[in-house]
Every structure is written in structure tokens, then in C-alpha cells.
A protein has these predicted regions:
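N-terminal cationic and glycine-rich segments that engage phosphates or anionic surfaces
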Residues: 1-425
Length: 425
């Protein structure tokens, strides 16, 4: 069956061209991630990322573009941050919420345009902060005012370029472009992590490696299971007679995912969690109480236990927040009522909205705890097995992005294949 689908995918000219175009954009992204910003010496950068937990996470998030000091060193961070800010603002400004939820595709396009515009100042600000932190710690050299202005413009343009590539990929119908680019960056780091792990290999660690890979298989299977899990709410449609024909009278269900927010909460939480460490690094070189306070704050947020607890709580918070923004039980209930649908044993309208919200909260609790545990898995796995080099494969952002993106892309490609197969009849 899979062989037939793959064969049809490559036989269909339109789908084949879309797939090849997406692969080409991946290549462009990886090339850009290896083009350094001109005029700045960054020889000590890789060593810094190996030793710094906060920036090491950020480097993984950008697919290694940060350690290469490339023109796209910020990755998709500014765009993701602008999305977080706008979605928070929908809860404060009713007009913005109406634009996002009630004005259809045109409203969402306008909302996305606001996100693009907000990305520009955020990218410039983050670029300036990053350059200043590196310069004050002596990691980069040759940072005069003209070169800094040029570098900030380059970094901002790089962030907008990646955002544009992500949107083009999304338009091809092969998956979410932003998630796919992050996925491509993570996959590109796999050979490097494997090499680093085996370069320090010793026969005494064989039991730890076996335990690690066994645990990895179990964790990945659990991620797939939870990602695909659904809670089906039964829905029936009333019978209606029009002329001599009868409509409705069928039963179906409303699928409710255990993990409706997908990978977004982990990405949001990671973006927020990186800020304290970056700010502490920025002010840590100041003299007096400012530098002392920044250093103390940096040590506080770099503590493994504090970092893990904050990460866990932020993921749970953003799971509920993102689901509240994107999934509205009241709208679901109204749409069901308009189409003549109802949940057996529940009154249509407000009662259905309350019922759906109750089920959603119960399901979401399981999904939020699961996401929180996935976020802190690298520390747990490393503590159990003593193996640290491969933790990127089984924990946090890396694991969930890889699994979620693969499953989502396969789903969208299957939908494209089915649509083309129907057209052939």
C-alpha cells in the first residue's frame, strides 16, 4: 500500500514538483545556515555553545545556524515570538480576537500580516542583544559601529527570509512550513551529535547505551500514541424531509485530540525560557550591583532543577493558553446547532458548549502533563542512563517536533494523494 502511494506521488507531476520544490527550499535554508555574517570574527563561538546551556538550547532551535554565526542565526525565533505576543493580545483586545476568530480567511491573513510586521523590530532587537552579549564576553571581535549596523540589518533580513521560506512551504500543502524548517534544522544536527557521542565511546558504557536506546524506543512509541490519540464525542443529525427525499439521520463523532496544541506549547515555552538567561548574559559584564544581580539571576535560571520545573510549568500553561485561543467550544456548539447536529443526551446550544468544554479540559490535562514530561525528558534520560550525547533524540522540542511534523506531513500528503485519486475517476 505504501509502495503504491509513493509510486503515485512521484508519477503525479504536480505533487512531484511540490515535493521537489520543498526539498529545494530545505537545501536553501541549510546553505543560508552556513553563510557567516561578514566582517566579524567568531572563532570562539562553538566552544561557547558547548559550555552554555541556555544558548545551547537556542542553537538547537536554529539548527546550528547560531553556532555558525550565520545570516539566519536567529532562526524563526522572532516570528514565533511575534506570534506569541499577538495571540496574547487577542485576550486583551476584543477587536483583534474578532479579527482572528470571526472574520474568516481574510481576517486570518490580516492577523498574519501583523505578525510579519512585528517580526521586523523583534528581529532587530534580538540581533542587537545577541551581538552585544557576544561582544562583551569577548566571543566575537571586530564589532565597530558600522559593522554592527550592517550585521543587525543582515540578521533582520535573514529572519524575514526564513519566515518567507516557511510561508512558501506552507502554501505547497505539504505541511506547516515553520515546523518543517525547525524539523530540517534538528535533523541536520543528528550526524554531528552522533559523531560527538561515538568520539567519546568506551566499552564500559555499552549497558548504558543499550538501556538508553531501549528507553528511546519506548518514549518515541509513547509520543506517537499520544500524538495520534483522540477522544471521540458522538454527534447525531436530525432527520429532515425535503420533498420526497430524507436528509440527515446519520451518526458521526467530533474527534478531540489528546494533544490539540501539538508542538506549539514547547516552542513557546522554550522561547520564553531563553530570555532570562540572555538578559543575564547581557548585563553580567556590568560592574557593581547590576553585574552581580545579573550573574546571580543567570545561575538561578541555569540551575537544572529550577530550569526543569519552570519549563514543565510553562509548557502546561501554554498548552491551555494556545488551546483556548484556537479551540472555542461555543463556536463548535453553534456550528453543530446550525447544521442540525447534537450530542445525544445533551441539549443543543449553550449546554453542548459546556459539555464540550468539560471534555476538552479533561483531555487537555492528560495532554498538558504529557507535553511537560516530554519537555524535561533530556535531563531524566541522561540521569537514568548517564548518556548525554543522544538526549536531543528523545526529549523536549526535538522529539516532539520530529514526530509531530512527520505525522502531520504524512497526513497532508495522504490528503493530497486521495484528492488526486478521486480526480482520476
Amino acid at each position: 500500500m505504501w509502495y503504491e502511494k509513493i509510486t503515485f506521488l512521484f508519477k503525479n507531476k504536480e505533487l512531484r514538483n511540490k515535493l521537489l520544490f520543498v526539498i529545494f527550499l530545505f537545501v536553501v535554508f541549510r546553505l543560508a545556515a552556513n553563510v557567516p555574517i561578514p566582517g566579524i570574527g567568531a572563532e570562539n563561538l562553538r566552544k561557547f555553545f558547548d559550555q552554555n546551556q541556555v544558548f545551547g538550547l537556542l542553537n538547537l532551535f536554529t539548527g546550528g545556524a547560531l553556532s555558525n554565526f550565520s545570516i539566519v542565526l536567529l532562526g524563526l525565533g522572532p516570528y514565533i515570538t511575534s506570534t506569541i505576543i499577538l495571540q496574547l493580545l487577542t485576550m486583551i483586545f476584543p477587536g483583534l480576537e474578532k479579527l482572528y476568530k470571526e472574520e474568516g480567511e481574510a481576517g486570518r491573513q490580516k492577523f498574519n500580516q501583523y505578525g510579519r510586521l512585528l517580526t521586523i523590530p523583534l528581529a532587530a532587537f534580538e540581533g542587537y542583544g545577541m551581538l552585544t552579549v557576544f561582544a562583551r564576553q569577548g566571543i566575537i571581535t571586530g564589532l565597530s559601529l558600522p559593522i554592527m549596523l550592517s550585521a543587525i540589518l543582515t540578521i533582520t533580513a535573514g529572519a524575514m527570509f526564513l519566515m518567507w521560506i516557511g510561508e512558501i512551504i506552507s502554501e505547497q500543502g505539504m505541511g506547516n512550513g515553520i515546523s518543517l524548517l525547525i524539523f530540517a534544522g534538528i535533523v541536520a544536527r543528528i550526524p554531528i551529535n552522533i559523531f560527538q557521542t561515538f568520539s567519546s565511546y568506551s566499552p564500559a558504557q555499552i549497558p548504558s547505551y543499550i538501556a538508553f536506546f531501549a528507553l528511546s524506543v519506548v518514549i518515541i512509541a509513547g509520543v506517537v500514541l499520544i500524538t495520534e490519540a483522540r477522544r471521540n464525542i458522538p454527534v447525531s443529525y436530525a432527520k429532515r424531509v425535503r420533498g420526497s427525499k430524507m436528509y440527515g439521520g446519520v451518526s458521526t463523532y467530533l474527534p478531540m485530540s489528546v494533544n490539540p496544541a501539538g508542538v506549539i506549547p514547547i516552542i513557546f515555552a522554550l522561547s520564553i525560557l531563553l530570555f532570562p538567561g540572555m538578559i543575564a548574559s547581557y548585563f553580567g559584564t556590568y560592574a557593581g550591583w547590576v553585574g552581580s544581580a545579573a550573574t546571580s539571576a543567570g545561575l538561578f535560571f541555569n540551575n537544572v532543577w529550577i530550569h526543569g520545573v519552570l519549563y514543565f510549568l510553562l509548557v502546561i500553561l501554554f498548552t491551555y493558553f494556545y488551546t483556548a485561543v484556537t479551540f472555542d467550544p461555543k463556536t463548535i456548539a453553534e456550528n453543530l446547532q446550525k447544521m442540525g447536529g447534537f450530542v445525544p443526551g445533551v441539549r443543543p446550544g449553550p449546554s453542548t458548549a459546556v459539555f464540550v468544554k468539560h471534555i476538552l479540559n479533561r483531555v487537555l490535562f492528560t495532554g498538558a502533563i504529557f507535553l511537560g514530561l516530554i519537555a524535561i525528558l533530556p535531563s531524566i534520560v541522561a540521569g537514568i542512563t548517564g548518556v548525554t550525547g543522544f538526549t536531543f533524540l528523545v526529549g523536549g522540542t526535538s522529539l516532539l517536533i520530529v514526530v509531530s511534523v512527520v505525522l502531520d506531513t504524512v497526513r497532508q500528503i495522504n490528503a493530497q494523494l486521495q484528492m488526486r485519486e478521486y480526480e482520476n475517476f
